[in-house]
Amino acid sequence: DVKKSLEEFRPELSGLTFQTKLGSMLSKSDRMLKLGAELCPLFGFTTTETIKPFGRAVYLAKADLVTQMVTEMTSLQGIIGREYALRSGEDEVVATAIGEQYKTIPQSEIGVALALTDRLDSLVGLFSAGLAPTGTKDPFALRRAAIGVVQPLLEHDLDFDLNEAIAETAKLQPIEVSDGTRAKVLEFIEGRLRVVLRERGNAHDVVDAILGQA
């Protein structure tokens, strides 16, 4: 395993299923790559200095999922990717983003953008596949994914158009995404935002005012 570069693992993602209707992890990775390019303006990435490393981080983000170490211990996902990226000679900003993509609140701007791209693809795709959380059932951890969209935006005080981001994500899904589904995803994320704001001590009327402006 160690002799291979991170990029060399990527094609093997075709053998790893993300979800039956949504294809393999390679399909998801390809979608994320296209989505990332569309979302660059929303992330404020307008120059080669940010667009290029962000694209590279998205391209390599999931490659470590097929390494032996991650296969044997899934909690190492991202961590192993970062190590492989550094050993493969990737830029440190790329490796850092790969390493923190699964954290609720990544610290680097490229890490945040990578995490949001991944989580939006999962939320929109899985909602469209009829796999939205119900009651206590949330097999794809979509509540955590939604909090993972909200928390970085709040923590880094980012001005990010969620509605537009969801619309761009919907265009790239391999199955149809209805307007109703898009609205449900937005409502679901806003619901998590409401929870997070209240946990931070914001009064109900303040939360309503913030969400009213969103």
Residue ranges: model-predicted function:
Residues 1-214:
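Amphipathic alpha-helical "coupling" segments that flank catalytic cores
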